Amino acid sequence: MKFINFFVIALMAYANCAWAKTFTRCSLARAMYALGVPKSELARWTCIAKYESHYRTHVVGPANTDGSHDYGIFQINDRYWCKPSNGRSSHNGCNVYCDDLLEDDISESVYCAQHVKSKQGWSAWTTWAKCNGNLPSIDECF
């Protein structure tokens, strides 16, 4: 019986990953531009998404040292920016449920990421160090 339970859970996890969206650098740049993100910021956002989630929408990061988790294509933290489904306390600065940041429709993720940037700048993402001064071109995306 334990094997059957494990098999069902594994199958559900696989199905969830199989149906989740994975962007490319260009498809993400175009989607964000369509949502009103300035073209001058798109190279930065695509670089952050590359290192945070490999352009995948469904990623929930492992527990951080404080027990918080990061969600979605931009790995938004649940201690400060989104409300986790487990009921744990959060500042919820973006006024969004963390699970909404895992959707294929990235509008909530983009809104929240822009809000985080407006409060903390690009350095809110530790991966920014990999991008700063080494941005990918998005010219061929448009």
Curated annotation (Swiss-Prot):
Q: Which InterPro entries does the entry mention?
A: Glyco_hydro_22, Glyco_hydro_22_CS, Glyco_hydro_22_lys, Lysozyme-like_dom_sf
User: Which Enzyme Commission numbers does its entry carry?
Assistant: 3.2.1.17
State which tissues express it.
Answer: Expressed only in the midgut where it localizes to a few cells in the posterior region in all larval stages.
Q: Which UniProt keywords apply?
A: Antimicrobial, Bacteriolytic enzyme, Disulfide bond, Glycosidase, Hydrolase, Secreted, Signal
| Class of enzymatic activity (EC top level) | hydrolase
Keyword Disulfide bond on entry: yes
Q: Give Gene Ontology CC terms.
A: extracellular region
Tell me the compartments it is located in.
Secreted
Alphabetical list of Pfam families matching this protein: Lys
Q: Which residues form the signal peptide?
A: 1-20
Cite a single GO BP annotation.
Answer: killing of cells of another organism
Q: What does this protein do?
A: Lysozymes have primarily a bacteriolytic function. Shows antibacterial activity against Gram-positive bacterium M.luteus but shows no activity against Gram-negative bacterium E.coli. Likely to play a role in the eradication of ingested pathogens during their passage through the intestine.
Q: Which Cys-Cys disulphide bridges does the record give?
A: 26-141, 47-131, 82-98, 94-112
Where is it mainly found?
A: secreted
**Similarity comment text for this entry:** Belongs to the glycosyl hydrolase 22 family.
List of catalytic residues: 52, 70
Q: What is this protein called?
A: Lysozyme 1B
Instruction: Respond yes or no to whether keyword Signal is given for this record.
Output: yes
Q: Residue ranges of the C-type lysozyme domain?
A: 21-142
What's its catalytic activity? Answer: Hydrolysis of (1->4)-beta-linkages between N-acetylmuramic acid and N-acetyl-D-glucosamine residues in a peptidoglycan and between N-acetyl-D-glucosamine residues in chitodextrins
Q: Which GO terms describe its molecular function?
A: lysozyme activity
